Amino acid sequence: MGKKDKNKSPKIDIDDMAYRPCVGVIVLNAQDMVWIGRRAGAKTVNDPTGDGRWWQMPQGGIDRGEAPRAAALRELEEETGIDAGKVEIIAESSTWYRYDLPGDLMGKKWGGRYRGQEQKWFVLRFAGADSDVNITPEPPHEIEFDAWRWAHADELLDLIVPFKRQVYEGVLEEFADLFAKR
C-alpha cells in the first residue's frame, strides 16, 4: 500500500460546490452617485499586483435564518458604519446574481465550501452626511475597506476586481435609471 501525500489536497469538483448566499448594497447619495470602498488587504485576496486599484460596493453573507433585506442593512452598517436609520431601501434586484471565485481562491475562501457567491442586490438612498461613514468597524468585525468615495456608476466596471465584473454589469444595467448621469 502506498503512502498518501499529505501535501496534496483532494480534487475539488466545482459542479458539486454551492454558491454562498450573499447581499450586495448600492448606496446612492443625494446626487445619485454610488458609494464605493477600496478593498483593504486587496493584495492577498483581490489584487495580486498590490496596486490597490480594486474598489467595490458593500456586500456580505446572509446569516442562517436572516432575510436578505435585513442582511443588506447589517452588512452596510458593519462595512461602512452607516446606520439603517440613515437609509431607505428603494429597489431590489429582480434576480440573484452569481460569480465564481478564480481558481486560486476556490476551495480556500469561506472554508472551501463555496465556488462563489449568489447575491441579491439592494439600492439604498442615503439621507445622512459623509461624516456618518466609518470604515473602521468595532471588533470583532474586520476592516473591509481602507478608503471610500462617491463615484459615478459608469466608473465602477473599471474599478471592480475582474471576477466580479459580470455581476456589476448586470446590476448596473438593471438599476441604470437610478444613477447620476455625467
Regions found by a protein language model. Give the residues of each.
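Residue-level marker of positions within ordered structural domains that often coincide
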Residues: 30, 127, 173
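Charged phosphate-binding loop/patch that engages nucleotide di/tri-phosphates or the phosphate backbone
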Residues: 153-182
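Unchanged
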Residues: 60-162
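Residue-level detector of intrinsically disordered/flexible regions characterized by low predicted structural confidence
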Residues: 5-10, 94, 122, 166
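Short amphipathic alpha-helical patches
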Residues: 42, 99-103, 145, 172, ...
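N-terminal strand-loop-strand
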Residues: 2-58, 69
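Short, glycine/charged-enriched secondary-structure capping and boundary segments
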Residues: 41-42, 51, 104, 138, ...
